[in-house]
Amino acid sequence: MNSALNPVAASTAATALTPTSRPLVLGSTSPYRRELLQRLHLPFEVATPDVDETPLPGETPRLLAERLALAKARAVARNFPHAVVIGSDQVADLNGLPLGKPGTHERAVAQLRQMRGQTVVFQTAVAVVCLDSGFEQSSLAAVRVTFRNLTDGEIENYLRAEQPYDCAGSAKSEGLGIALLESIDNDDPTALVGLPLIRTCKMIQAAGVALFADRGEHP
């Protein structure tokens, strides 16, 4: 279901870089990804990626998520060439049909009606880029989510309560949206929220970020 780490650049396929004090940048304006990255207790900056998120003709949800995650990391890295940059993207995959952020109440209603009683795969991709070292890796976490057979009333009341219009699939699993679900199957617990931290940790450490550096915070 989920892929292993997939090196994109040949320079990173053989060996990882020695951890240093490289700055870390999150190439995303998502408050959910920012909150997840804060769990690592690492200093980081946030930058907005300027990327066209329009799907290519015939592009699958998985390929779309992978392409956009890498495009976001590369776009931000151009302004932070010495930093380790994280890019991420998530696309809900309903039987091959990509479902992005609804943006409006009406679209969110339509999405949840489509997904009720169905199993949806949330394709969550993350990419890490450091321009000056040539480091580039990406990985994908595929989260299988089965929705309850929701009534129209439940859908309407949920959306009014949580307004998840900036979330792929029109639900916030970290909030009331968990009540919409029958089951979740994945191997990277934070992937459904938008950033697979297990994969992210592996890649930023390989790129030169010291996850367990002594920060001088002794009792």
Curated annotation (Swiss-Prot):
The record marks Y32, Q90, E174 as: Important for substrate specificity. Keywords: Cytoplasm, Hydrolase, Nucleotide metabolism. GO terms for molecular function: nucleoside triphosphate diphosphatase activity. Its main location: cytoplasm. The active site is at D89. It catalyses: N(7)-methyl-GTP + H2O = N(7)-methyl-GMP + diphosphate + H(+). The keyword Hydrolase applies. One of its GO terms (cellular component) is cytoplasm. Its EC number is 3.6.1.-. InterPro entries: ITPase-like_fam, Maf-like. It is found in: Cytoplasm. One of its GO terms (biological process) is nucleotide metabolic process. Its cofactor is a divalent metal cation. The keyword Cytoplasm applies. It is an enzyme of class 3 (hydrolase). It comes from the Bacteria. Belongs to the Maf family. YceF subfamily. Nucleoside triphosphate pyrophosphatase that hydrolyzes 7-methyl-GTP (m(7)GTP). May have a dual role in cell division arrest and in preventing the incorporation of modified nucleotides into cellular nucleic acids. PANTHER family: 7-METHYL-GTP PYROPHOSPHATASE, BIFUNCTIONAL DTTP/UTP PYROPHOSPHATASE/METHYLTRANSFERASE PROTEIN-RELATED. HAMAP family: Maf. This is 7-methyl-GTP pyrophosphatase.
